[in-house]
Structures are given as structure tokens and as C-alpha cells.
Amino acid sequence: MKSAEIREAFLRFFEEKGHTRVASSSLIPANDPTLLFTNAGMNQFKDCFLGLEKRAYTRATTSQKCVRAGGKHNDLENVGYTARHHTFFEMLGNFSFGDYFKRDAIHYAWEFLTGEKWLNLPKEKLWVTVYATDDEAYDIWTKEVGVPAERMVRIGDNKGAPYASDNFWAMGDTGPCGPCTEIFFDHGPEIWGGPPGSPEEDGDRYIEIWNNVFMQFNRTADGVMHPLPAPSVDTGMGLERVSAVLQHVHSNYEIDLFQNLLKASAEAIGCANDDAPSLKVVADHIRSCSFLIADGVLPSNEGRGYVLRRIIRRACRHGNKLGARGTFFHKIVAALVAEMGDAFPELKQQQAHIERVLKTEEEQFAKTLEQGLKILEQDLAELQGSVIPGNVVFKLYDTYGFPVDLTNDIARERELTIDEDGFEREMEAQRERARASSAFGMDYNSLVKVDGETRFLGYQGVSGAGQIVALFRDGQAVERLEEGEEGVVVLDQTPFYAESGGQVGDSGYLEAAGVRFDVRDTTKAGGAHLHHGVVARGNLSVGAAVKAEVDASVRQATALNHSATHLLHAALRQVLGDHVQQKGSLVDSQRLRFDFSHFEAIKAEQLKALEDIVNAEIRRNTEVETEETDIDTAKAKGAMALFGEKYGDQVRVLSMGGDFSVELCGGTHVSRTGDIGLFKITSEGGVAAGVRRIEAVTGAAALAYLNGAEEQLKEAASLVKGSRDNLLDKLGALLERNRSLEKELEQLKAKAASAAGDDLSAAAVEIKGAKVLAARLDGLDGKALLALVDQLKNKLGRAVILLGGELDGKVVLVAGVTQDLTGQLKAGELMKQAAAAVGGKGGGRPDMAQGGGTNAAKLDEALALAQRFVEQGL
């Protein structure tokens, strides 16, 4: 079976078992700052397992795209050199949220693997592990499924602590956890290795193909395991691994999917399609890089973008080792799209963008290699001994993207070695940081957990009645909040919008007889709206009825900005291109902020075009239409999804100007585009590599902004004794007059310097046949001193000159040496000494150098160094 056929068979099997087929989530985890990348099928269901979110289904199946670059699971440096390490892989999974448990999960796995209709693997080739004390799973496998005891292995705590086992999974130090059962395929005695749990288990004979995790406990901070009221199931089977089994090969790189990518990689590089590890690196890395870019990641020097940059550069380096000339990596994207584009349509949609990003980064890396070589040369020049320190190798690798193997090659050419142990210590420290960042980073038992959902009334108005279903103080559920206490109120229904999609939460108040709760902010936990605030009067109790009143003026101003954000997004794609993707936003009552992908600053004419397009849509005054539909129908209509946002099966589609703007959005908006009134961009700039930011105002705030600009124009006109009509002419004349005066001043300075030069030349002293002049001239800048040094060199002949002075509280220094002395005396060396004396730095050419410092009190001492410098140098 081909990889694509296995993927489809798996999803179809579980659909027939009542599971909902759920699309792969983005590689950028939605609303989860604790994860760098999606690295498991369960990531998108994390809140379901935590009990913070309820979905319309209790059974799900997915083929999840995953990235593991670094850390304990998949060391980047191993990719290409082992049979099963990858930066990108697909995880097939089936999930139960409080529905079926161990029995069904085990039977489903066995049926899919061994059933004649499905994978039809020989049963005698399958081994199974269970957690040592999980008798329930063991009995299901042996007594119901029929796996013989000799192919069953109990795995205990093998990692030095209770429940620290290959067969016990935990979300963190506290929270949901439980035993797991793993299924292994036996490749046969001709392959070295032993069964799981044996000393030879790391061999290639027995390969894990499926893991079933049974979340049945909640571990509290004291280490006690409490049974969960609704146990869940999380499973994972690597598509590449099971494909290798079914295609009778021992390396993932031999499966159909990789064979095509290896061929395309060899053609792009211009090398033989053989078993070279470097070729496997390129074929693997094109997958992770392309999918990351398709999901909105761009190369940068931090976070996710930094990981992407490292993977791209590693691929380029390995391509260069194989003889690649020029850019090649981006040429492989087409082969990947042909291989995986049907299963992941985002690859097809983003192909041109992916190719452009990769080519740009390849070109940048060529420059980086050149820079890295210069830095390495500097470090080698200062090296004492024959070993390049590990921290230097790591700095080149980690900070400058300089490949370790290249550093090693250069060291070998110089008969040097690198400190591999020191480098590994630095790498391990980085891995530990990665491991720490990959944990979920939360205490499950301290989270606010609310059963049920709050019905949102805010689309219909800004007020409504509700009943208090829960109260929280300091994160703990309480029955009552007293006057003056801060807390959180949860209602059964509310008009208050909870912060999401970049729109801030509503503010206002909750009121009943003798009671008032001032709502400062509204957020969401699962499906519940949390009203944060303080009891201003009386007290609140669970079960009490209240009137909820949103601050209408703030809500309306926020709606103007949110609707304008949608119009701006559409305009950006018109003006800049379809590669524009939203990277984040902030919408409140004062302004809007919109971050998006783009590679360069926006030109002034483009900014004007954006404003013109948005304001034209505002003037059209079209109706803002909303529709509730399923996610697939919405995407088929071309609705754009918000970056980093999670969507359920049913979504709200917001349309403006017909098909001018169609987006998925749950926020509050105007009724017609004309309600926005006016749109004005206030700033544009870069916030990260490949990410730009526009800030703007609307409505009354836009009018106030323009009125303020008008007042500034009037003030500027008044300063130049003109009017708004002739302001540009007045400013032009003023600038021309200023240039004329500056030119006149330079001429006067030159005359003064010439006169000073005549006076100074007489002060030169002769040392060993050379004239030495050191003088203090306060108030002159570096340019004037340079001109004076040139003049003095011509006057004095064979000479060394050091001039300095104080200007605006800082020291300015210039040194000069005539050409006939530069073989013995260098101006740059003199400058280093003089600048150091005044607490600064300097340098330059052998015949001319500049510097400066901050300690003017030491200037005379610095100038005195000139004579000693000549005495020692001649």
C-alpha cells in the first residue's frame, strides 16, 4: 500500500467506528504558548482532555502533521543518519473524550492492523507492551484479542521514579495521566535487536508502530492518583513507520513518499540519487520547511522562525556538500506538492510563497557563510593551542548558523581540532531548554474549570438577563463574593463578548437589587465566559439572577475598529498580493493593530492605496452579513481563517461588500460598512522578520487624528511666517537657506583650520628623524580634524600627528602617519592606545585613523602618548 492509501484507510476505518474525521491542525499550536510546534496528534484536543472544552463529538480521528526539531524526541542532528528520525512526520490518531476506553481502543487497533479488509499484518509478527501494573490491558490483549503471553511485555518504572516509564504517559507533573500500551512489529531474526524491555531493544528488529494512551488518572501535587470520572484515549501511529512495514523496507527513506522526494532532491542538486545521508537530510527538510511556511512561519532569529531558519540552512549546507551550485532547495517544493498536496491543500495554495521564502533564505545563507568564515578567522587568530573551544564552535553554530561540520573541516585543514565534548555540553544545555519549553507548563488542578457553556447574547444587543452559575475568587470556586472583593462571575447567558480573535473583552456591569458588580474584562475558559471585576455594592451568590449591561459606547467603538480590520486585510491582499496572511491583531475602542506577512516596508503610495480602498468600501455602505455554517462549507466559499485561532465544526462567516471580504469571525461588528465613518493609517513598520504591522484609527478617533494633523500644519506654517497654502514653498526656501549657511560655515572652518595648521606646525618636535605633533583643539568635529591632519602631513613631510579635542562632552581623536613611515608606525595602532586612554575605542588605516572616548579629563595624557609611540616604534 502507498502512504496515501494507508492514511485514507486509517481515517475511513475509524469513521466507520463512529469517529469524526477532523482536519490536521496548524503546526503553530492555537492559543498554546507552551508549545513551539504541534508535535503530536493530541495537541489540538488538549483542552478536551483537560475538561476545559466540549466538542460536538466524543470520538475523533486525524492525520496530524507534526514537527519535532530538537529535544528528546527527535534530535535535528540525527536526521538523515538514522532510519526513522525526521523533522516532519504524520501522526495517525484516534481519540475518545470520555467515550470508549481500553477495551474498544485495543480491539480497534488490532482489527485495523490485522484485519483482511485493512492492513492485514501477520499477527505472529506483532508484539505488545503494557504498563507493569495494568492488568486490565494485559487481560484484554491475552484473553480477548488472543496475543500469546510470550509476545506480551510488562514495562515498569524504568526512568528512576514512580510512574516514570516508557509505558506511562503524563501531561505534566500534575493533571491527566495514565498507562499506555504499545504495539511493535518484528522484522525478523535477520535484523539485529531484541524485543521491547530487553537489553537489545534499541536494535532495528522490533519497531514500535502504534501507541495507545489511556488517560484514567488525575495526579495531584502530592503525587496521589485519583481516577478520572470520564477516562479518555489518545493514540498515535506514525504514517512513515507503518508505511515502511507495509512496503517491506527497513528505512522510512525507502518508502514511496520519500523515494520521490529523494529523486527530486538529487535532480535539483545535480548529484547521484544514492544512499548519501546528506540527500536524506534535504528530502526530509523540504517537508518541515514547506509545511511551516505554509502555516505562516517565516525565517527569523527567534522562536519558531529561528528553528525554521536552522532547518533551511542545514538543508542548504548538505546540498552544498553534495555539490549544489547556487540556490536549489526551493526547486524541490513542486515535487512535495505533487506528493502531498491532495492531502494537505495548503501546500498547493501556498506553493509560490513557499518557493519565494526558501529562495530568499538560501541567498541570505550564502552571505551568512561568508560572514561566519570571517568570524571564525578572528577566533582562530586569537586561539592559544590547537583546540577550538566548544563554546566558540557553538557560538558559530547557534548564533551565526555556521555548520559544525564546516568548522571541523576548516580546523582539520589548519591541523587543529574542535572541542567536541565542550560543544556537546552547550548543545545539551540548549536541548534542556527545549525540553523545558515543550512541557505544557501548567498545573491542571489550578485551572478554572466550568462545566457547560455560556450562551452569548451579544450579537443581538448589549444588555440581557442571566443567572450566576459559578463564582471564583483567586482561582478557587466559591459560593459568594462580598462587597469590595475581586473575582470572576460566570453566567448561564451574557451579552458580554469574551476576548478572542484579537478583539478585547467587553466591560460594563452586572446588577441586581442592592448589588452591582463592575466588569473590567471578559475572557473565555472552554465555552464559559468569565466576567472579571469587583463587587462595587452588596454581595453576589451562585444562583442569583442579574441584569448584564455592556458599556455600549466602548462596544460600538471596538466594533468600528474590528470591521475596519477585515476591510484592511482584504485591501492588503489586493495591494500587496495573496501571500499576505494575518499574523495577529489587537482591536479595542481606541485603535486597531494588524500584523501580517510581507517581506519589505510598504511604500507611501501603497499605504495611500490601502486607505483609498478601505474608505471606498466604507462609502459604499454595504451590509455586513453573517452566516452560521460548517467549517468545510465556509472554506469552500473562500472564507479566510484567523491566524492562531481554533474553530469548531460550526463557524460564523462574516462578509463585507459581497465577496470583498469573507472571513471566519466570532467578533462584534457594525451593521453596515458606512458605520465605520472614516479609516486612517497612523503607522506602519516591521515587528519581526517578514512580519509588518499597521496601526490605524476609525470614526471619531480618525477625525480627531486628522484635526490634530491640521493643527500641526497651522503651527508649522506660523513658525515660518506662512500659511498652509504656501507652507511647502516656505520650508523649501528655509532648507535652501540652511544649506547655504552650512556651506559657508564649512568654508570658515576650513580657513580657521588652515590658520591653525600654520600655527601648529611650528609646535612639532623631531624624534629619530620624524616630526611628531600632538595638539588639543576643542570644539572641532572629526571632519575638521581630519582635514587639518591632511594639511599638516603636507606641511611637515615625514611626520606622525595626533590631534584631539572635546566636543559636546565627548573626546574626538584623529591620528595621521605619512606614507614613508607606515612600514614602521601605523596610525591605527596609535589610535587604539590614545582612544583607550580616554575610555573609548578607535582604529583605521596605517596612514589615517579616528577614535573617541568619554573621559575628557584624560585627553592630555592621551595626546602625550604620541611621542612615546614614535620613540618605541622607530
UniProtKB/Swiss-Prot annotation:
Domain notes: Consists of three domains; the N-terminal catalytic domain, the editing domain and the C-terminal C-Ala domain. The editing domain removes incorrectly charged amino acids, while the C-Ala domain, along with tRNA(Ala), serves as a bridge to cooperatively bring together the editing and aminoacylation centers thus stimulating deacylation of misacylated tRNAs.
Cofactor(s) the protein needs: Zn(2+)
Subcellular location: Cytoplasm
Cofactor annotation remark: Binds 1 zinc ion per subunit.
GO cellular component: cytosol
Family the UniProt entry places it in: Belongs to the class-II aminoacyl-tRNA synthetase family.
Name of this protein: Alanine--tRNA ligase
Species per Swiss-Prot/TrEMBL record: Pseudomonas aeruginosa (strain UCBPP-PA14)
PROSITE patterns in UniProt: AA_TRNA_LIGASE_II_ALA
UniProt entry keywords in alphabetical sequence: Aminoacyl-tRNA synthetase, ATP-binding, Cytoplasm, Ligase, Metal-binding, Nucleotide-binding, Protein biosynthesis, RNA-binding, tRNA-binding, Zinc
Pfam families: DHHA1 (PF02272), tRNA-synt_2c (PF01411), tRNA_SAD (PF07973)
Sites where the protein binds Zn(2+): 562, 566, 665, 669
Positions of transmembrane segments: none
